[in-house]
Amino acid sequence: MTESSDEEISSLYIHLYFDEDVSAGIVESLRTRGFDVLSARDADALGKSDDEQMLYAVSQHRAVVTHNRVDFEKQHRKFLERGMKHYGVIVAKRRRDVEVISKLLALLDAVTAEEMQNQLRYI
């Protein structure tokens, strides 16, 4: 059995970037559970375009979590059409925070960071 590096272990878990439309309560709930989360507010990226948000998430090796289905479906397609890699887009239907958290936790439990690459998932 070989030893895994911290980087290999951390790559098993999806690192999340929440755009500004997602509730701060959702971000904090996942953060207190020990997940690696970053919000647009944390990144001083409030008011940035969807292109800028997506590029920032990619630069940080993070999957985007958003309620903005239409625009981030376009971002996903654009990346694929250009042969560019992204770390995933998770579109969360607008619902109570506790429901979004539950859906995110189920996804995080079932999907690795590697499996999430270039994927568009709906919760």
Spans of features found by a protein language model:
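Acidic, PIN/NYN-like endoribonuclease modules and their adjacent C-terminal/linker elements
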Residues: T2-S11, H15-E20, A24, S29-T32, ...
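Acidic, metal-binding active-site segment of PIN/NYN-like and related structure-specific nucleases
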Residues: D50, V58, R62-Q75
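Conserved BB-loop
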Residues: D36-K48
